[in-house]
Amino acid sequence: MTNIRKSHPLMKIVNNAFIDLPAPSNISSWWNFGSLLGICLILQILTGLFLAMHYTSDTTTAFSSVTHICRDVNYGWIIRYMHANGASMFFICLYMHVGRGLYYGSYTFLETWNIGVILLLTVMATAFMGYVLPWGQMSFWGATVITNLLSAIPYIGTNLVEWIWGGFSVDKATLTRFFAFHFILPFIIMAIAMVHLLFLHETGSNNPTGISSDVDKIPFHPYYTIKDILGALLLILALMLLVLFAPDLLGDPDNYTPANPLNTPPHIKPEWYFLFAYAILRSIPNKLGGVLALAFSILILALIPLLHTSKQRSMMFRPLSQCLFWALVADLLTLTWIGGQPVEHPYITIGQLASILYFLLILVLMPTAGTVENKLLKW
């Protein structure tokens, strides 16, 4: 009799993806973030579902409905803070996952990488719309500033912005549609993530050396299932420490003030995970130029496979490229810091230099380093 795990049409799919999957024997903890992202997504969908049961997407009641969730709903406060801080954990895992892909050359799996870039953009859009829903000051002004950037598009800009707003300013129509999109997008993300996984399993995982591991595979279960469970426990530990001890650490105090179109907060800034892109946007004095730089700062990821010049896949044995990679990480941290600072000297100059360095590292220095390393190895 054949094993049901291997013969049942549905169980067979699960088996081939999570149980009998041949995996490289040497993948490190940097390969844990894929499963952690899956856990984050499920957690966000579940907490979000319970929040949606008590939330009202109307400008007059949105703020008080969130207050009601925190004060009157059973365990509403923990659900709300798990959802808000879960987004932060989601982005930490996302950036680690992308960084791993850059470092170890995983971007040579073109379909998997490009779908990953689409996933990143979709998650960013979802998080942005979610931040608008509590209808605090930063929600309202963040929505106003970011949607208003589209008005920089020549000819159709103004019409486009008013079409997105559903009026002449961010108002009830905007909040309602943002709630609708924020609800549906995570399910779309889940579907795209399945395609991401499908394409990954066509080629199999990369590994730290960047060398084919076909000669040395081990079954996913029990080795990597137990490893993923450990990662999941650490993720939940970190999330719950944040939720129970410092729930507002990563939030903005301005968002505890109800949205007021007549009063602009002194410093409009997005959540911490968008600050690097926000700093690049602000570093260019021209509106359209800033918008293009902002878009390109994320879309540049799609160009990474074309910019790979080295004859080695991974950076494991390429010290020159390693130095530049960590310079890029430091540069992104600098941009994140600058994005949260007011627009004044010396922050403006630091932001401009960090923005130039960001594009210089990716477009010029790293491809050059790859070529130099080939020459040094007489390849």
Swiss-Prot record:
InterPro entries: Cyt_b/b6_C, Cyt_b/b6_C_sf, Cyt_b/b6_N, Cytb/b6-like_sf, Cytochrome_b, Cytochrome_b_C_euk/bac, Cytochrome_b_N_euk/bac, Di-haem_cyt_TM
Subcellular location: Mitochondrion inner membrane
Domain of life per record: Eukaryota
Membrane topology: Multi-pass membrane protein
CDD domains xrefs: cytochrome_b_C, Cytochrome_b_N
Transmembrane regions: 33-53, 77-98, 113-133, 178-198, 226-246, 288-308, 320-340, 347-367
GO BP of this protein: mitochondrial electron transport, ubiquinol to cytochrome c
Binding site for a ubiquinone: H201
Record keyword DNA repair present: no
GO cellular component terms attached to this protein's record: mitochondrial inner membrane; respiratory chain complex III
Cofactor: binding details: Binds 2 heme b groups non-covalently.
Subunit structure, as described in the record: The cytochrome bc1 complex contains 11 subunits: 3 respiratory subunits (MT-CYB, CYC1 and UQCRFS1), 2 core proteins (UQCRC1 and UQCRC2) and 6 low-molecular weight proteins (UQCRH/QCR6, UQCRB/QCR7, UQCRQ/QCR8, UQCR10/QCR9, UQCR11/QCR10 and a cleavage product of UQCRFS1). This cytochrome bc1 complex then forms a dimer.
Known role: Component of the ubiquinol-cytochrome c reductase complex (complex III or cytochrome b-c1 complex) that is part of the mitochondrial respiratory chain. The b-c1 complex mediates electron transfer from ubiquinol to cytochrome c. Contributes to the generation of a proton gradient across the mitochondrial membrane that is then used for ATP synthesis.
Remarks, miscellaneous: Heme 1 (or BL or b562) is low-potential and absorbs at about 562 nm, and heme 2 (or BH or b566) is high-potential and absorbs at about 566 nm.
Family of the protein in this entry: Belongs to the cytochrome b family.
Protein name: Cytochrome b
Species of the source: Bos indicus (Zebu)
